[in-house]
Regions:
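Signature of N-terminal electron-transfer/Fe-S-associated modules in redox systems
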Residues: 1-155
């Protein structure tokens, strides 16, 4: 049975009538054109589908859209429109952290969440903050350095 689900998406109030058990990632990508939310593992393990739900980082591939009713969601599209998001994205580009690019939206979300809660993280804190996100291209060192660069720039 379909239900009307209302939530804030990247600062804009939206609603959709759909099956509340549909995966949130599918609604974001298919109904709201948030193509930066990537699907990797479909099990909540790789972090490619990371979003901010009420300011907390979550994996949207394992959350039913019904759980988003009345909540605030920020995707990479919303983060990239903020000053902090632009600083992080620029630091990733300048630091050479982007190769294939598939994991980067999730990595940027993780970095945004980390730096919002800890503006001057240690290397161990950065690695812990990124631990829910998988990258098979860079080996993480360039990503960690890019997070440091973003923190230094005020991200």
């Amino acid at each position: 049975m379909e239900s009307r689900i209302c939530f804030s998406l990247n600062g804009k109030d939206v609603s959709i009538t759909t099956d509340p058990l549909r995966r949130l990632i599918d609604v974001l990508r298919e109904d709201f054109d948030c193509k930066g939310v990537k699907e990797g593992c479909s099990e909540g393990e790789c972090g490619a589908c990371s979003i901010l739900l009420n300011g907390k980082m979550v994996t949207s591939c394992i959350i039913p859209v019904g759980a988003a009713d009345g909540q605030q969601i920020m995707t990479i599209e919303g983060v990239s429109a903020t000053e902090k998001g632009r600083i992080i994205i620029d630091a990733f580009a300048d630091g050479g952290a982007v190769q294939c690019g598939f994991c980067i939206p999730g990595m940027v979300i993780a970095t945004y969440y980390l730096l919002s809660n800890n503006p001057d993280p240690t290397e161990d804190e950065i690695r812990l903050g990124l631990s829910g996100n998988i990258c098979r291209c860079t080996g993480y060192d360039l990503i960690v350095e890019s997070v440091r660069l973003a923190a230094k720039r005020g991200g």
